[in-house]
Curated annotation (Swiss-Prot):
Reaction(s) catalysed (UniProt annotation): [HPr protein]-L-serine + ATP = [HPr protein]-O-phospho-L-serine + ADP + H(+); [HPr protein]-O-phospho-L-serine + phosphate + H(+) = [HPr protein]-L-serine + diphosphate
Catalytic-site annotation from UniProt: 139, 160, 178, 244
Organism expressing this protein natively: Listeria welshimeri serovar 6b (strain ATCC 35897 / DSM 20650 / CCUG 15529 / CIP 8149 / NCTC 11857 / SLCC 5334 / V8)
GO biological process assignments: regulation of carbohydrate metabolic process
Family according to the record: Belongs to the HPrK/P family.
Protein name: HPr kinase/phosphorylase
Length: 312
């Protein structure tokens, strides 16, 4: 699932000036890629990415000023197709009247920005990539723990929300409860957030729905967070083998990404919030180059080797 974005959304997000064709602001933008139509101004249309936002900078405007008005109008009309979402002019450059005429005829918005072309292209691309990223919904709770986005999963009633509440009381921040919307912004980044209708809310069985921001303040919540690790809670199974050393690293797949996963068995007497908090701290430590399990194994092997040599 992807969220739709219109030219109007882009205009409002980047505070762009509308030059013409207000009725065309509802045109959809289907790709985050931009087009700098330099070759098209020379008449080369063998490959014209018509479905992209067409960005004009100093180069395109300066080149078009050297063309005859009739030829300039012809080129702009060729650029105006049913799939073209908008034309954007950078640097507050003067918009060619032929472009305005062609865009009005095709009902395509022409927008203008004060920003330099390179910076404007970065802002547009980043915004569109974020809005057009594929999105899925997952059942779970997302909490920011020591700067790491920890997605807590598990079956209904296992204690995810109660654990999140305890983590918030310990100074961490809630991102989403029950329904986590996850979007893949690029090949290495998953961003989790909450649906607007349940943002900052936490459902506790026997207590009901509470507003975390109202109870604990603005510092106890955040709107989105990059997902770094998944902690899966499951009821303790006495017949199942659970990792006791920490050498093996589980993975779980979200979209096409493998995310580190820790399975935590749940049974009375276990303080889940502390376990998850320490799991996040230990994960950070591993990323910094220290692995307690590997160090223990190495020390144990050294001790065994030393004792063996002594016996020999």
């Amino acid at each position: 699932m992807t969220k739709s974005v219109t030219v109007k959304d882009l205009k409002e997000r980047l505070n762009l000036e509308l030059i013409c064709s207000e009725t065309g602001l509802e045109r959809p933008i289907l790709t985050s890629d931009l087009s700098r139509p330099g070759l098209e101004l020379t008449g080369f249309f063998s490959y014209y990415p018509e479905d992209r936002v067409q960005l004009f900078g100093m180069t395109e405007i300066s080149f078009s000023e050297g063309m005859e008005p009739e030829e300039r109008l012809k080129r702009y009309k060729q650029m105006c197709t049913k799939r073209t979402p908008a034309f954007v002019i950078s640097r507050n450059l003067e918009v060619p009247k032929e472009l305005v005429a062609a865009a009005k005829e095709a009902d395509i918005p022409v927008l203008r920005s004060r920003l330099k072309t390179t910076r404007l292209s970065v802002y547009i691309t980043n915004y569109l990539e974020s809005r057009l990223a594929p999105v899925i919904s997952m059942h779970g709770v997302l909490v920011d723990i020591y700067g790491l986005g920890v997605l807590i999963t598990g079956s209904s009633g296992v204690g995810k929300s109660e654990t999140a509440l305890e983590l918030v009381k310990r100074g961490h921040r809630l991102v989403a409860d029950d329904n986590v919307e996850i979007r893949q912004e690029d090949e290495l980044t998953l961003i989790g957030s909450s649906p607007a209708i349940i943002e900052h809310l936490l459902e506790i069985r026997g207590l009901g729905i509470i507003n975390v921001m109202t109870l604990f303040g603005a510092g106890a919540v955040r709107s989105s967070k990059k997902i770094t690790i998944v902690v899966h809670l499951e009821n303790w199974d006495p017949d199942k083998h659970y990792d006791r050393v920490g050498l093996d690293q589980e993975k779980t797949k979200i979209f096409d990404m493998d995310i580190p996963k820790i399975t935590v068995p749940v049974r009375p007497g276990r303080n889940l919030s502390v376990i998850i908090e320490v799991a996040a701290m230990n994960f950070r430590l591993k990323n910094m180059g220290y692995n307690a399990a590997e160090q223990f194994t190495q020390d144990l092997n050294n001790l065994i080797g030393h004792n063996s040599s002594m016996n020999d």
